[in-house]
């Protein structure tokens, strides 16, 4: 009797490796909404997969699946079981393994999105895990947020300031926030967004394409 044959793992056919985009920010700032909008805005042109992080659940994976951001098989939820910061920086092994598993399923993926669990302004991604980092804050957190600094504010490749529509309700001055952001970030870019209304999403997509050399 012949031994059973098993299909060899699919191999990547594209020359360039996939771009890994890390999305971080405090709880409730709009990370999952941004990821949803990016997937919906880029999935027709690029082969996408997404990894979400939660401490004790896979809630963000569920929300993205319900929203139809990507087919269910292309969204993987990771339960970190501890500090969200650790899982993307000091010991990113659980996320590195998730990336490896997703690329085994979809070897020709162009972009791997990795959404961190909600964390503070000190959160940063390990360079082993992410090629580009996007940090999301929101106006509802207060006009002072950009002035507080922290690696997420000052060192991320792109800062997204979300929920601009709430500025009048919380007494935040968007011009002051923009000025403070420029002082804290120097030449590093930022985008003012109202993600629910898709305002600013195109700018984030353009940044990913240009900075990630996807348009070359």
Swiss-Prot record:
Family, similarity comment: Belongs to the SIMIBI class G3E GTPase family. UreG subfamily.
Domain of life from the UniProt record: Bacteria
InterPro entries found in the cross-reference section: CobW/HypB/UreG_nucleotide-bd, P-loop_NTPase, UreG
Residues that hold GTP according to the record: 25-32
One Gene Ontology cellular component annotation held by this UniProt entry: cytoplasm
GO molecular function, one term: GTPase activity
HAMAP family tied to this protein: UreG
Lineage summary: Bacteria, Pseudomonadati, Pseudomonadota, Betaproteobacteria, Burkholderiales
Compartments in which it is found: Cytoplasm
Subunit structure: Homodimer. UreD, UreF and UreG form a complex that acts as a GTP-hydrolysis-dependent molecular chaperone, activating the urease apoprotein by helping to assemble the nickel containing metallocenter of UreC. The UreE protein probably delivers the nickel.
Protein's name according to its UniProt entry: Urease accessory protein UreG
Function in brief: Facilitates the functional incorporation of the urease nickel metallocenter. This process requires GTP hydrolysis, probably effectuated by UreG.
Keywords: Chaperone, Cytoplasm, GTP-binding, Nickel insertion, Nucleotide-binding
């Amino acid at each position: 009797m012949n031994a059973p044959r098993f299909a060899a793992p699919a191999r990547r056919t594209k020359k360039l490796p996939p771009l890994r985009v890390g999305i971080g920010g405090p709880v409730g700032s709009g990370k999952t909404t941004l990821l949803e909008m990016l997937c919906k805005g880029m999935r027709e042109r690029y082969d996408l997969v997404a990894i979400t992080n939660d401490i004790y659940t896979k809630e963000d994976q569920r929300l993205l699946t319900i929203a139809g951001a990507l087919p269910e098989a292309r969204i993987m939820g990771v339960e970190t079981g501890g500090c969200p910061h650790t899982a993307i920086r000091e010991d990113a092994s659980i996320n590195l393994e998730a990336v490896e598993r997703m690329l085994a399923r979809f070897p020709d993926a162009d972009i791997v999105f990795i959404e961190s669990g909600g964390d503070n302004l000190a959160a940063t991604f390990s360079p082993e895990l992410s090629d580009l980092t996007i940090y999301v804050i929101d106006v509802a957190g207060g006009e002072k947020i950009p002035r507080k600094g922290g690696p997420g504010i000052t060192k991320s490749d792109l800062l997204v300031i979300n929920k601009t529509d709430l500025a009048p309700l919380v007494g935040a001055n968007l011009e002051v926030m923009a000025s403070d952001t420029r002082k804290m970030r120097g030449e590093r870019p930022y985008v003012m967004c109202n993600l629910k209304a898709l305002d600013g999403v195109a700018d984030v997509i353009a940044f990913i394409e240009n900075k990630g050399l996807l348009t070359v």
